[in-house]
Swiss-Prot record:
Major localization class: membrane
Parts of the chain that traverse the membrane: 52-72
InterPro entries xref list: C-type_lectin-like (IPR001304), C-type_lectin-like/link_sf (IPR016186), C-type_Lectin_Domain_Fam1 (IPR052309), CTDL_fold (IPR016187), NKR-like_CTLD (IPR033992)
Residues on Cytoplasmic side: 1-51
Source organism of the structure: Mus musculus (Mouse)
Cited Gene3D superfamilies: Mannose-Binding Protein A, subunit A
Residue intervals annotated with topology Extracellular: 73-269
Key words, A-Z: Disulfide bond, Glycoprotein, Lectin, Membrane, Signal-anchor, Transmembrane, Transmembrane helix
Disulfide bonds listed in the record: C164-C256, C235-C248
Protein name: C-type lectin domain family 1 member A
Glycosylation positions in this chain: N94, N126, N168, N202
């Protein structure tokens, strides 16, 4: 075997050799070389992980900051929009109240204008015995808020009722003093013509009712009844300013009435 060292000097020059002087013999020992772990030191392993976590934390913080900024902007925008909506609601409420006030004033002006037109038209109508401003059909008489027609045709009571209905009217009704003052003078005739009214009863002793179902007022006028006549006298006529109970099958003239229309201001000229 070939010796590792050719001389003592060579052995001394070797850093890996140690001489023991205490034992009196030369003992050569080799310094153990440091072993490196295959996986490296712990610090070298955790450093990338820590950097990654730190990066993620920074990204998360930036995201939270951006989200907070967006939320703050949205909150400000929401408050601005809410204030704008509230302001618009207040303006809309004020405009609505103003519109209602203007509509009320407009209705009042229209009513006033209509009252003036009716008054003027009535003066023209009464002065000339008729005028184109009249709210009644041609040949109908205008009194109060109604139109009246006293026909010359003679029919029984039931036929007169149908006759009036066909003309968009009803049989004459006298329920106020004003209507009585107007209707009775129309009944004066030199030829004994009387007019059926809408008052009748369903047999002797029963209540007198108008065609609309309202009761007859005994205080307004008296119905003259002939107790000696055996025939049923359950329908009322007017003749020479008085009311009479007559047989409903007798032939009398028809008196009809209807609600007057509106006076057209343009027809006052």
């Amino acid at each position: 075997m070939q010796a590792k060292y050719s001389s003592t000097r060579d052995m001394l020059d070797d850093d890996d050799t140690t001489i023991s002087l205490y034992s009196g013999t030369s003992t050569v020992t080799r310094r153990a070389e440091p072993r490196h772990s295959e996986n490296g030191t712990p610090s070298s392993v955790w450093r990338p992980v820590a950097l990654t976590l730190l990066t993620l934390c920074l990204v998360l913080l930036v995201g939270l900051a951006a989200l907070g900024l967006v939320f703050f902007q949205f909150y400000q925008l929401s408050n601005i929009q809410q204030d704008s909506i509230t302001e618009k609601d207040e303006k809309l409420g004020n405009m609505s109240r103003q519109l209602q006030s203007l509509q009320a004033q407009n209705r009042k002006l229209i009513e006033t204008l209509q009252q003036v037109a009716v008054k003027l038209c009535r003066e023209l109508y009464n002065k000339s015995g008729g005028h184109r401003c009249s709210p009644c059909p041609e040949k109908w008489k205008w009194y109060g808020d109604k139109c009246y027609q006293f026909y010359k045709e003679s029919k029984n009571w039931q036929s007169c009722e149908y006759f009036c209905l066909a003309d968009n009217a009803t049989m004459l009704k006298i329920s106020t003093q004003e209507e009585l003052d107007f209707a009775m003078p129309q009944s004066y005739s030199e030829f004994f013509y009387s007019y059926w009214t809408g008052l009748s009863r369903n047999g002797s002793g029963k209540a007198w009712l108008w065609t609309d179902g309202t009761p007859y007022s005994f205080e307004l006028f008296e119905i003259i009844i002939d107790p000696t006549n055996l025939r049923n006298r359950d329908c009322m006529t007017i003749f020479n300013g008085k009311a009479y109970s007559k047989d409903c099958k007798e032939l009398r003239r028809c008196a009809c009435e209807r609600i007057a229309g509106r006076v057209v201001p343009g027809e006052l000229q």
